[in-house]
From Swiss-Prot:
This is Exodeoxyribonuclease 7 small subunit. GO terms for molecular function: exodeoxyribonuclease VII activity. SUPFAM superfamilies: XseB-like. It is found in: Cytoplasm. The lineage of its organism: Bacteria, Bacillati, Actinomycetota, Actinomycetes, Mycobacteriales.
Length: 85
């Protein structure tokens, strides 16, 4: 999900992957990891701020994915009502 704040590669998705390229599940999973790391504590201020900023970006992207899904459902339901109405 994220790189270790000390720069060590944890073997998960790097924080350098643009948020815009992540699907909903990847954003959600990385956001959960960011929250876990922040709650765990022990990070210096700069590392905490970098994680927090990444978390904000991930949360916004998750909301965009969910808004798109809601719109798709609304569109399908509106189309069904128009055909049956």
């Amino acid at each position: 999900m994220v790189c270790d704040p000390n720069g060590d590669d944890t073997g998960r998705t790097h924080a350098t992957v643009p948020v815009s390229q992540l699907g909903y599940e990847a954003c959600r999973d990385e956001l959960m990891e960011v929250v876990r790391l922040l709650e765990q504590g022990g990070l210096d201020l700069d590392a905490s701020l970098r994680l927090w900023e990444r978390g904000e970006q991930l949360a916004k992207r998750c909301e965009e994915h969910l808004a798109g899904a809601r719109q798709r459902v609304s569109d399908v339901l509106a189309g069904d009502e128009a055909q049956n109405g």
